[in-house]
């Protein structure tokens, strides 16, 4: 690879990334959280630590893809070698990623677009709830319909491929800058969300791209540091290496991606950082071994933008598509060449790369294209995308793109109603003393906080901004708003109908330093609503876990004088909440990033039109210092490969860690209140198969891996009752405790089931949880397979990870042979 690189880059001067969209964060503030890598840290270099798995497996059309696979093979047989190189190499163009057309074969190319909460490079498109918001619903129907609706908009804008959904980051660190793009700090909940999201996109006719595969758990040093005085490939320091052991990889980080593969995901996006030394996009153990062999993945692997660091080595390791195709930071210097492109042609001609491997790369790309019928009547790319795409503006295009069809087409349909409902269903009621909520015909309301009002920095959240509601985070995972309903706007609209007096103060500095009794007139309000926000973005990890803009002191200032202070947070995820125990803080709502209907969603909950049923997809600790697994934010050495993140906590992230060490928390994983109350009773468990062995039957691999792992082996049922006075939705959760003889490090309990159950007052309903073999298995590093341990399991069902009300014991393994 080194000699090829010298051929490519000899004589090239350093190039700037003009006009591209940058996502690397600025330097951290002095008071920011900081974790300096110890000097004695073991350093994993790029080679020799992650085992080689070669050659890259050929696709076979498994998983009902046989007809599409045959079409793809026929298509490849008609290509010239140069066209084959084009099919695996991105080009700058109207979309975030582009594969050029081949008109003589009737192939119109491929359009790849961000992202996980909206089609970002588009106008007149909806901005949906963020991943963490969707996960907070704990609602399978919502997880599916959110992806389906987004898929409809992607397709209508001419995008074949949605760069979504996100399972990496999983949420190892509370400070992760992109945690909000993903779902939950738990592999099971994230896995369900991934599977349903993939199905939703595909049912809308759009290819899903689970990302970022794998171990992408922090933003700091996710990419190499390039030499500003060198060529476009000269690196001063390599990207951080996520060093993960085999069992942790399988039981935590691979788990939700297995769900995505099981759902027949079209493509996977490999991540930026290194993994056990080797860059993720040229790590053959991960791409060939885990994904294509163990999980039977039949689609293609694309690089994250600029995540390709070699040509031949990456191709052999299992990378099928280089995005966006160029060199340098984020691959946005196409005029400097490409690791793929013409070098693929050259490598085939000189025998360095077998042409059959290139053929399989394209078969993998084209099979889902045919499977989803994208060769038939697919909408053209909206020409406005070319004007909005700052990643590859027209001045950088090297090829012609025939952009036809309606410009700035409105693809939103009636999705606003769906987004509003999703935001309300995701809202988590953390505290509700004295039945402060729902609001009861208030005569006067006081609104405080810089999150309440209209956004003040345009339609796209490119950076943090002081004034205006926060409905999305920043980076490639954000969306372009056509409108945002602010909380203040929605409250004023609702209050007008009831002749309620609404007064508001949106300057946090003023509120935090003022006696608020001097602000409101003529008498104290019935309730004081404080709106707070927390920004997070791609490219940098969070500097703290507190709310932004001195929000804590805003709450304390208001609560000193108002005995009915209600706090609402629009946040990327975990916040320290030092005001939670204040006696005058009567209610707290966590709304995360709800998308364009933000204000309407929260008003529906505040006034009781919707009974809150959101539940936490992570743990809120009492103190930020209680969290483990910090991101590496600084190193004390200068070696080129010194940036390391050792996942020494192994399986102990989030609630698993707090449970294992018996640490008190403020609000536990799965927690959330309602305007009603629920009870559980009559737990029962029955096997679904006659005999269960520890070792699974070795069946032919299908997408998702060994089909035996996906077999339902036990059914657990419980009765849920609404014991309150209003209708509501219960969220029963099932947790499994493994036998004592399971290998050391097994968490005390693990989520393995959940449901969302609407109930009228006094109504009861039986709920069933079906446990698959994989749900009762651990990864055995010796035999390299999933095993159900012999002995007694404890099954608990409750309403959070620490509110477990029903328990039953089972002994699944009845066949020890």
Curated annotation (Swiss-Prot):
Gene3D superfamilies: Glycoside hydrolase family 3 C-terminal domain, Glycoside hydrolase, family 3, N-terminal domain, Immunoglobulins
InterPro entries found in the cross-reference section: Cellulose_deg_GH3, Fn3-like, Glyco_hydro_3_C, Glyco_hydro_3_C_sf, Glyco_hydro_3_N, Glyco_hydro_3_N_sf, Glycoside_hydrolase_SF, Ig-like_fold
Enzyme active site: 304
Pfam family, one: Glyco_hydro_3_C
Keywords attached to this entry: Carbohydrate metabolism, Cellulose degradation, Glycoprotein, Glycosidase, Hydrolase, Polysaccharide degradation, Secreted, Signal
Compartments (UniProt record): Secreted
Glycosylation sites: 40, 58, 229, 276, 343, 350, 402, 507, 563, 584, 623, 662, 679, 715
Gene Ontology process terms (BP): cellulose catabolic process
SUPFAM superfamilies: (Trans)glycosidases, Beta-D-glucan exohydrolase, C-terminal domain
GO cellular component, one term: extracellular region
Catalytic activity, reaction form: Hydrolysis of terminal, non-reducing beta-D-glucosyl residues with release of beta-D-glucose
Enzyme Commission identifier(s): 3.2.1.21
Molecular functions (GO terms): beta-glucosidase activity
Leader sequence residues: 1-20
Pathway info: Glycan metabolism; cellulose degradation
Protein family (similarity comment): Belongs to the glycosyl hydrolase 3 family.
Function: Beta-glucosidases are one of a number of cellulolytic enzymes involved in the degradation of cellulosic biomass. Catalyzes the last step releasing glucose from the inhibitory cellobiose.
UniProt protein name: Probable beta-glucosidase G
Gene behind the chain: bglG
